[in-house]
Amino acid sequence: MQDALTAISADHAPGRSQGSERLRLIWRNIFPFVVVGAIWEIIAWSGIFPRRLFPTLEDVVSSFVNLTITGILPHHAIDTLIRLLSGFALAAIAGVTVGVLMGRSRRAEDILLPLVSIGAPIPGLAYAPLFLLWFGLGNLSSVLLVGFVSAFPIIFNSWTGVKAVKEIWVRSAQAMGADDRRLFRHVIFPGALPYILTGLRLGLAQAWRILVAVEMLAAVPWGLGWLIFGARKFLNTDTMMAGIVVIALIGLALEKFVFQKIENYTVVRWGMISS
């Protein structure tokens, strides 16, 4: 009987262990948000700031729910997401292409690196007036500006990644008869991919910053940036916070369901980085 109980206990122990580990992982992920939320509530109820300027979490959640139910918040979010993904797609294609070209060609590096080095430090908003004059008010100028500004970190990281590929990998592949196409596909690009993914993450963050700001300047009728700046005029801080929360949620979703999926399927599976 004792042996049977021991066997049953042993059978169920892994399940309990996995369940506990899952709970710890969930708690570890939400703990920072719990801390920030608690601090926010303390400040909101302390009276340091007027309630209208520093709403409670209840006010923010209420505004979020109301704007979502009425369809206003989803409309703004979808318009912003379309602009973001369109501009970021342009940046990703151009940035990776230019960065890889600079890393593989010394002549391209000599020509392009000074231009990229000059353009990258200039704040994105400094380019906004030019893009608005060239392409007019509306979506086109917003998308092109997002693509232009967010391409710089992608270029730099792609270039660095290609340069960081170990020479012994390249020589070994060449010794085994790999042509330039196979060398790039099986050695150069996989070796540079961790850097490229980092550049894409930085580029996406840059795209968010410039898009939210330029949505007001470009006089687009919808968008989270337009919503936030419009709410500021009427001191609707809860609406502003609701827009910021949506930006954070979209960013989190892109990180979890796009970047981490790509990372796990490639560089983690290849053993280049730990999960």
Predicted regions and their residues:
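Transmembrane alpha-helical segments of polytopic membrane transport and secretion proteins
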Residues: 1-34, 256-275
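Periplasmic/extracellular loop-to-transmembrane helix junction in inner-membrane transport proteins
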Residues: 14-23, 46-89
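Transmembrane-helix boundary motif in ABC transporter permease subunits
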Residues: 86-116
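Short cytoplasmic-facing helical segments at TM-TM junctions of multi-pass membrane proteins
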Residues: 114, 157-199, 225
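Transmembrane alpha-helices
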Residues: 144, 148, 180-214, 238, ...
